[in-house]
From Swiss-Prot:
Pathway(s) the chain acts in: Metabolic intermediate biosynthesis; chorismate biosynthesis; chorismate from D-erythrose 4-phosphate and phosphoenolpyruvate: step 7/7
Record-linked InterPro entries: Chorismate_synth, Chorismate_synth_AroC_sf, Chorismate_synthase_CS
Pfam families per the UniProt record, alphabetical: Chorismate_synt
Name the UniProt record assigns to this protein: Chorismate synthase
Function: This reaction introduces a second double bond into the aromatic ring system.
Complexes and interactors: Homotetramer.
Native organism: Rhodococcus opacus (strain B4)
């Protein structure tokens, strides 16, 4: 089974991603990972950290000469700011006098509404929010994006598919309602400052960000992930835990600041009558044809051959420049929340992280379905299955 885990803190020496269960022969280089991490830093409305944050990638194990070996994969994403934080974030004990001289070490006792600070301090018995925010930070997603580069490579080599995303809306901007982008559109989407697939939508999003910036506020938004060309039958209806839509929803909800997920037309489908909610089928020369994809490529917890389409809603960033009302945990008195440098909007980057999680989950489901210890073996198993499906539909 494909499994992944990350370790590390936002201002620690490095983030680490571990990926277990990936087959041998997946073609991935350090440069490929760096490319995906650079995409994660994209986006209009990002903060100052993105200007000097550089992700130094080191593949520690599981890869030789650009190909996976079949064993556990470890990737380290170094923190270029580590020298500034070496004393404060040291894993080993530090002399109290040394810490006292560090302005950055001042206790953070005013939790931010909407962040993990308050609950984390109480749950783990911390008097300071620093240990909470360091791990809860969205910086952790860099490690997930690194791990997912292998899943993306696997899906590309076995199925010939690409995972892409685009921003549907930011704040109250006019939502995009046009056709689904394809893999050939990814470069154009990444070239957009807000990763939009439409110029009018892009302009509306930028206007929203500029207005929030002037007001000392932050914005959320909606992203969509699309994969064209997946085979029928990834996932299962056998149990709730095996349903691919449930697994995708869990993975996307596990991204920092994501508060909602929908598959296909999702919540809009609930407003329709059954006759207008489903994707009718008719025979075609090469199989079943559908004129709509309201289900988002998933029926009964399984892929149905149509484009996989899922959306995630990101809340506004909880580190608000004008600061929200809170309580100082050291005194119990009213206070304003702590404010560290932050983005006005990180929705474009959230799309790249959402791609990563979808890639990992779909690769996991594909390995469960087709098995194998190498890319060649998995691809051969898939080809046999695809031939059988095609023969059955041709009857």
């Amino acid at each position: 089974m494909l499994r992944w885990i990350t370790a590390g803190e936002s201002h620690g020496p490095a983030l680490v991603a571990m990926l277990e269960g990936m087959v041998a022969g997946v073609e991935v280089t350090s440069e490929d990972i760096s490319t995906q991490l650079a995409r994660r830093r994209l986006g209009y409305g990002r903060g100052a950290r993105m200007k000097f944050e550089a992700d130094k990638v080191t593949i520690v194990g599981g890869v030789r000469h650009g190909r996976t070996l079949g064993g556990p994969i470890a990737v380290e994403v170094g923190n270029t700011e580590w020298p500034k934080w070496e004393t404060i974030m040291s894993a080993d004990p530090v002399d109290a006098d040394l810490l006292a001289d560090q302005a950055r070490n001042a206790p953070l006792t005013r939790p931010r509404p909407g962040h993990a600070d308050y609950s984390g301090m109480l749950k783990y018995g911390f008097d300071d929010a620093r240990p909470v925010l360091e791990r809860a930070s969205a910086r952790e997603t860099a490690a997930r994006v690194a791990a997912a580069t292998f899943a993306r490579g696997f899906l590309r080599q076995v199925f010939g598919v690409e995972v892409l995303s685009h921003v549907i809306s930011i704040g109250a901007s006019d939502p995009y309602a046009g056709p689904e982008p394809t893999a050939s559109d990814l470069a154009a989407i990444d070239a957009s400052p807000v990763r939009a697939f439409d110029k009018a939508a892009e302009e509306s999003m930028i206007a929203e960000i500029e207005a929030a910036k002037r007001d000392g506020d932050t914005l959320g938004g909606i992203v969509e992930v699309v994969i064209h060309g997946l085979p029928v039958g990834l996932g299962s209806f056998i149990s709730g835990a095996d349903r691919l839509d449930a697994r995708l929803a869990s993975a996307l909800m596990g991204i920092q600041a994501i508060k909602g997920v929908e598959v296909g037309d999702g919540f809009e489908t609930a407003r329709r009558r059954g006759s207008q909610a489903h994707d009718e089928m008719r025979p075609g020369p090469d199989g079943i044809l559908r004129s709509t994809n309201r289900a988002g490529g998933l029926e009964g917890g399984m892929t149905n051959g149509e484009a996989l389409r899922v959306r995630a809603a990101m809340k506004p960033i909880s580190t608000v420049p004008r600061a929200l009302a809170t309580v100082d945990m050291s005194t119990g008195e009213e206070a304003v929340a702590i404010h560290q440098r932050s983005d006005v909007c990180a929705v474009p980057a959230a799309g790249v992280v959402a791609e990563a999680m979808v890639a990992l989950v779909v690769a996991q489901a594909a390995l469960e379905k087709f098995g194998g210890d190498s890319v060649a073996e998995t691809a051969a198993n898939y080809e046999r299955y695809a031939s059988g499906v095609a023969a059955r539909l041709a009857r």
